[in-house]
Amino acid sequence: AENWPRFVLPSPALGIADRIRRHTAAGRPVWLYGHNMGGGFAVAVQEQAAAGLAPAASPDAALALHDNPERVKAQGVSITPSCPKGYAAVPLADYEPGFWDGLLSAAGLPKPSLVVAAAQDHGHHPEGNRVGRFNLWRALLTETQGDPARWLYDTSPTPCTRLNALQQCTGGPVADTATAAVLGALAAPEVAKRSQRQGVTVVNVGNSHVAAFLVFKGRILGVYEHHTGMLDTDALLFDLKEFGFGWLPDEQVRAKGGHGCAFLAPLPPEAEGFAPTFAVGPRREMLLGYAQFIAPHGDM
């Protein structure tokens, strides 16, 4: 697919990290407030704490650092509902309407009538993000019986605290980023047609996480998720082959640092091991020569 115009911008978390670092350099402690969002600015917060500036956060903003308030405090961050005197207030949000309205206005474009957004959400799980996130996948797979159309939420599930916050800002449907990847892949004609004849594997090789899906006749029959930095090509290929036959134990994935894997059992034999593999994502070169690279709607 060609000629799909888009804005490609740094993530909101990177912009927030830059603001925090500028305040740190100026000797100003920050108070984070606003919404739960992606925690890519956490290192900048830790740097400020290490500099002795005692960063703070509102209860909602603290969720972007960890679900467990004690873990947030252990990072040197105090939790307070109002901005302490002498602190610089830094707002948090995955989607800030004023920014987007300004950007579109500067480009001479109208405001959208609908905003559809995706974010990675581990759910509210104080004991750890890995456990919480894969519990969400397992429940989603079972409750929807693998119907991908139901993975796009008109109303985000209560445990999905980041998607809840995102939807408060956008007012439109939301989804997990891995869901967006597999739905995009299924919009590619070659994937849709092939998956009607035999099972296929769709792999999203992201900067931080690898997510793989077993797809057959319009249904998702398996989900696998791991950390990209913990895998090389051989390890990923081994996991994908075992995953395709339903042989990969969830415990094995978690023991090696991944999130886990889950299936709608039994996998149909006519899916033939889900051997054809289609890859998307910024790190898809890990599967160069082993998967067909696709770019649904122009996005890889």
Question: What kind of region is each of these model predictions?
Answer:
Residues 1, 195-217:
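Gly/Thr-rich phosphate-binding beta-strand-loop-beta motif of the actin/hexokinase/Hsp70
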Residues 2-200, 226-233, 246, 253-300:
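Nucleotide/phosphate-binding catalytic cleft detector across ATP-hydrolyzing
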Residues 112, 209, 219-221, 274:
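A broad structural signal for short, well-ordered beta-strand segments within beta-sheet-rich domains
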Residues 213-245, 252:
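A beta-strand-loop signature enriched in Asp, Gly, Thr, and Trp
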